[in-house]
């Protein structure tokens, strides 16, 4: 009984996120936020359940890389490409709002996310077709992401939709000038790939994404800018979609989101943060994603340097990304995911406190 009480699982996260959104709705005197979250949670359940049946009929099954942890081989043949169905309700919402508001910001947001969605779809499709864990080559995927990101950044910068001023507080403002361009590129490509790297354990990326979208939506509300209100709605809808998907993606996963889902989610976070000048706060909220990505960069970098210097590569971690390191240390998959969720919740609290204090 004690073990069950202490377990922090999908239901625990859903209840916590729901109460947090009720509190947010109460504080900002607008219950549309909790309404949007609940609506898209159930839309996600519906889309994922029906999508799962379609995926099984089409035999779209996950291939597991041989160099990964041995306990992952049992995940082979799990239905994948769930992100295809996860994102459909969001695209419909975004398209409707974009048409009604005739907003260039929202139009660029829609095109950018859809570009990453197609990139992920191609990667997933080729992976299944070739019966390998990877579809597009790393360079091919990076080129596609880069082209999409550069088009968005240049158009947004030209129309003054990206603010070069990084506002940390009322008295601490940094003017990035032209350097906002490479920073924006790093944010967009970086966060999308970081979410993709985090999507290696059942429920890890979906759970963390649901948490981060809540934090980002709340932070945008705290800016008290009427024109940004719609972005909070989009964030809370994505939070609901991610947690709805988590119902089927938590351990043991019945479906994976694939690159279609992870790249789309990351692109949504990055693009919204850039358009709402929330990059600094997102960097705190997305601490788990960033650490996962950094663990890969450090692992590869150290290995290459030591191999060149000592003719024998050394590794910092047993395996990267970081969640695999803990797996090989003997920590159970569910426990790793639960702890990462808890850390992410603390990062949301930290980011919001800093927003209030600064």
Swiss-Prot record:
Q: Catalysed reaction per UniProt?
A: UDP-N-acetyl-alpha-D-muramoyl-L-alanyl-gamma-D-glutamyl-meso-2,6-diaminopimeloyl-D-alanyl-D-alanine + di-trans,octa-cis-undecaprenyl phosphate = di-trans,octa-cis-undecaprenyl diphospho-N-acetyl-alpha-D-muramoyl-L-alanyl-D-glutamyl-meso-2,6-diaminopimeloyl-D-alanyl-D-alanine + UMP
In this UniProt entry, which cysteines form S-S bonds? none
The record's keywords, sorted A to Z, are: Cell cycle, Cell division, Cell inner membrane, Cell membrane, Cell shape, Cell wall biogenesis/degradation, Magnesium, Membrane, Metal-binding, Peptidoglycan synthesis, Transferase, Transmembrane, Transmembrane helix
Indicate whether Ribosomal protein appears among the record's keywords.
no
| TM annotation in the entry | 27-47, 81-101, 106-126, 147-167, 171-191, 201-221, 228-248, 255-275, 278-298, 336-356
The protein's required cofactor(s) are namely:
Mg(2+)
Cellular localisation: Cell inner membrane
Primary enzyme class: transferase
Gene Ontology molecular function: metal ion binding; phospho-N-acetylmuramoyl-pentapeptide-transferase activity; UDP-N-acetylmuramoyl-L-alanyl-D-glutamyl-meso-2,6-diaminopimelyl-D-alanyl-D-alanine:undecaprenyl-phosphate transferase activity
Domain of life, per UniProt, equals Bacteria
Pfam families (UniProt xref): Glycos_transf_4 (PF00953), MraY_sig1 (PF10555)
GO biological process terms held by the UniProt record: cell division; cell wall organization; peptidoglycan biosynthetic process; regulation of cell shape
Please name the InterPro entries in this protein's record. Answer: Glycosyl_transferase_4 (IPR000715), PNAcMuramoyl-5peptid_Trfase (IPR003524), PNAcMuramoyl-5peptid_Trfase_CS (IPR018480)
CDD domains annotated for this entry?
GT_MraY
Assigned GO CC terms: plasma membrane
Pathway named in the protein's UniProt entry: Cell wall biogenesis; peptidoglycan biosynthesis
E.C. number(s) listed in UniProt: 2.7.8.13
The annotated topology with respect to the bilayer is: Multi-pass membrane protein
PANTHER family linked to this entry: PHOSPHO-N-ACETYLMURAMOYL-PENTAPEPTIDE-TRANSFERASE, PHOSPHO-N-ACETYLMURAMOYL-PENTAPEPTIDE-TRANSFERASE HOMOLOG
The record ties this protein, via HAMAP family, to: MraY
This chain's function reads: Catalyzes the initial step of the lipid cycle reactions in the biosynthesis of the cell wall peptidoglycan: transfers peptidoglycan precursor phospho-MurNAc-pentapeptide from UDP-MurNAc-pentapeptide onto the lipid carrier undecaprenyl phosphate, yielding undecaprenyl-pyrophosphoryl-MurNAc-pentapeptide, known as lipid I.
Q: Which family does it belong to?
A: Belongs to the glycosyltransferase 4 family. MraY subfamily.
- Kindly provide the name given to this protein in its UniProt entry: Phospho-N-acetylmuramoyl-pentapeptide-transferase
Q: Which organism is it from?
A: Prochlorococcus marinus (strain MIT 9215)
Q: What is the lineage of its organism?
A: Bacteria, Bacillati, Cyanobacteriota, Cyanophyceae, Synechococcales
């Amino acid at each position: 009984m004690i073990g069950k009480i202490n377990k922090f699982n999908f239901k625990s996260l859903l209840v916590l996120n729901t109460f947090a959104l009720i509190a947010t709705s109460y504080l900002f005197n607008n219950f549309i936020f909790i309404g949007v979250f609940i609506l898209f949670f159930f839309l996600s359940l519906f889309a994922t359940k029906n999508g799962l049946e379609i995926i099984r009929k089409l035999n779209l099954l996950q291939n597991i890389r041989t160099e990964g942890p041995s306990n992952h081989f049992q995940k082979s043949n799990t239905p994948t490409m769930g992100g295809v169905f996860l994102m459909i309700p969001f695209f419909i919402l975004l398209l409707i709002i974009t048409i009604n508001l005739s907003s260039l910001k929202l139009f660029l947001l829609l095109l950018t996310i859809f570009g990453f969605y197609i990139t992920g779809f191609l990667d997933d499709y080729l992976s299944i077709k070739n019966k390998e864990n990877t579809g597009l080559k790393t360079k091919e995927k990076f080129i596609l992401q880069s082209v999409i990101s550069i088009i968005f950044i240049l158009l947004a910068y030209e129309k003054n939709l990206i603010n070069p001023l990084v506002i940390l507080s009322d008295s601490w403002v940094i003017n990035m000038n032209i350097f906002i361009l490479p920073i924006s590129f790093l944010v967009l490509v970086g966060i999308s790939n970081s979410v993709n790297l985090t999507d290696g354990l059942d429920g890890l990326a979906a759970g963390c994404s649901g948490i981060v979208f809540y934090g980002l939506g709340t932070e945008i509300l705290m800016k008290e800018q009427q024109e940004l209100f719609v972005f909070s709605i989009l964030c809370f809808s994505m939070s609901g979609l991610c947690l709805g998907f988590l119902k089927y993606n938590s351990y043991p996963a019945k479906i994976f989101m694939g690159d279609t889902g992870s790249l789309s989610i990351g692109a949504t976070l990055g693009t919204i943060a850039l358009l709402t000048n929330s990059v600094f706060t997102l960097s705190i909220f997305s601490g788990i994603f960033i650490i996962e990505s950094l663990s890969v960069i450090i692992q590869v970098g150290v290995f290459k340097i030591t191999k060149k210097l000592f003719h024998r590569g050394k590794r910092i971690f047993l395996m990267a990304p970081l969640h695999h390191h803990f797996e090989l240390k003997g920590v159970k998959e569910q426990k790793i995911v639960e702890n990462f969720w808890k850390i992410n919740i603390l990062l949301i609290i930290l980011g919001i406190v800093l927003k209030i204090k600064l």
